[in-house]
Amino acid sequence: MEWERATERERDTRFVELGRYLCEVRSGQYWRVDNLKSFDEFLEKRFPESRRKAYYLMAIHEQLPRIPKPELREVGWTKAIELVKVARREGQRFDSATWLQKARELPKEKFKQEVERHLT
């Protein structure tokens, strides 16, 4: 049980690298090396606890390429996925510096509310 918690904590701190890795596996179809039928089957095998989280990590990698990785690590994956929502909506107009500052300053729930207010 402690090992599982330690593994989850490591995933939470290495989410930037993990998102990049998952995107590479999907785009290169490296899941076929294990004789799997699909990328989803790969995720079921490697991320049995949460395929959704795996897709979140991939979205962070794909949607926030201009944000320095240490800054993403600093705010954490749950706030980074909220940043993804704003980045998708605003596209090239996304002001990452302003939103990163908000992510650093606000508690998780307050930041989520700020994003929801912005998007509605």
Regions picked out by a protein language model, each given a short descriptive name:
Residues E17-E24, D40-R117:
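Amphipathic alpha-helical "recognition" segments
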Residues R20-N35:
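Short helix->loop/beta-hairpin flanking segments within DNA-binding domains
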Residues M1-E17:
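Short, charged, low-complexity amphipathic alpha-helix
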Residues R9, V33-D34, K45, K102:
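Short N-terminal micro-motifs specific to bacterial/archaeal maturation
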Residues A6-T7, S27-G28, P68:
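Residue-level detector of alpha-helix boundaries and kinks
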Residues R11, F15, R32-L36, R51:
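Alpha-helix N-cap/helix-initiation sites
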